[in-house]
A protein has these predicted regions:
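N-terminal redox-cofactor-binding region of secreted/periplasmic oxidoreductases
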Residues: 1-148
């Protein structure tokens, strides 16, 4: 049996980032576990085909509990390399500034928008966007859908 310094459970967006950062230390061994596979279905590579992901092998196919007026509501969650980020139509959405500032105001110092902005910028590669708000050298390419 192999020994690992860290075990990261879930190869979704956050799990992959955490595992990558931890593994940058040559003295650290990281195991990244994921329940699903690494296959890339059409709905994962073509934004307009995202509905193909729903109910597929890449979707845990979760649903809410029974709702009073609507029955259960589908709650798709990604199963596989990339997690829910692999089945969400390639949409990259940052929270609103007010949400982060609300966290800081509620007693979470260091979690305000201006505190987190440098972290967001380090993660993004958003060429042609406002450099005061977007990064240009990060690993996550962010931009409009090609051809739109």
């Amino acid at each position: 049996m192999e020994d690992f310094s860290y075990v990261v459970v879930g190869a979704g967006t956050a799990g992959c980032v955490v595992a990558t950062r931890l593994s940058q230390d040559a003295d650290v061994r990281v195991l990244l576990l994921e329940a699903g596979g690494s296959e890339r279905a059409r709905g994962m590579t073509m934004p307009n085909a995202w509905p193909d992901n729903l109910g597929s092998a890449a979707d845990w196919a979760n649903a809410t509990t029974e709702q009073a007026e609507a029955g259960p509501v589908a709650f798709p969650r990604g199963r596989g390399l990339g997690g829910s980020g692999a089945i969400n139509a390639m949409v990259h959405v940052r929270g609103h500034r007010a949400v982060y500032d609300g966290w800081a105001a509620s007693g979470a110092p260091g979690w305000g928008f201006s505190d987190l902005l440098p972290c967001f910028q380090r993660s993004e590669q958003a060429a042609g966007r406002d450099p005061a708000l977007r990064g240009i050298g990060g690993p996550v390419r962010v931009g409009p859908v090609p051809g739109e």
